[in-house]
Amino acid sequence: VKGQLCSRLYPQTDHRISADDDLLIPDGEFMACHEQLLTNGLTTDTPADELASADEVSYTKKGSLLYIELHRHLFDSSEDAHDDLNHFFTDINPVETDGFLAMPPHEHLLYLILHAYKHFVRSGIGLRQFCDIGLWARAYHVEIDWQRLHEQCESVHAATFAAAAFCIAGDYLGIEFDLPAPWDGSIDVEPLLHDTLCGGVYGSNDLTRLHSSTVTLNAVKASRTGEKSSVLR
């Protein structure tokens, strides 16, 4: 997911470098993939007794910049605010995309949006995530079910964020594509754009933003469960 699948859409792939490579592995294949990585000289710091249940396991290779993360789920199941996002991606049949086995284009765009949304409510996001979303939407426009995408985003209160991401990509980053109904192309994106530019590359450039994200995450969780936020009483 993300990474090289997105960088290949940039005019120059080196403009979209990745610190790691994220691989989504079905639970039934996870340990086999783990063993294969060890066979190829990679190592992990995750204790052996945690491998069977860990959502994410990281691997490095001595003398190499290679950094791989295996994921059982796209969103950490230990985070109450985001765990329910995983249901969008169950029982998906992968397709081959430029030599990679990946989610179909519609689901991958949904993932890019929800992944960016997760970072936004946690601490903030960077312009690169808007580039990823815009370039993917433009490249696979005809393969996206735009009505269903809107319904999916709306069901988790992310439709306004997604519309703003599309508008920033098109109006400010020059990644032009048609935004069909029911998407709102006239949304005011200035507050989100300002927040993005103030947040640094990854959005978390100061402790104040990281602290305030605790309140935001709690509100997101409450909005999905119908509960009252427990941070502000």
What do the predicted segments below correspond to?
Residues 1-19, 25-233:
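Conserved NTP-donor binding/palm subdomain of two-metal-ion nucleotidyltransferases/polymerases, i.e.
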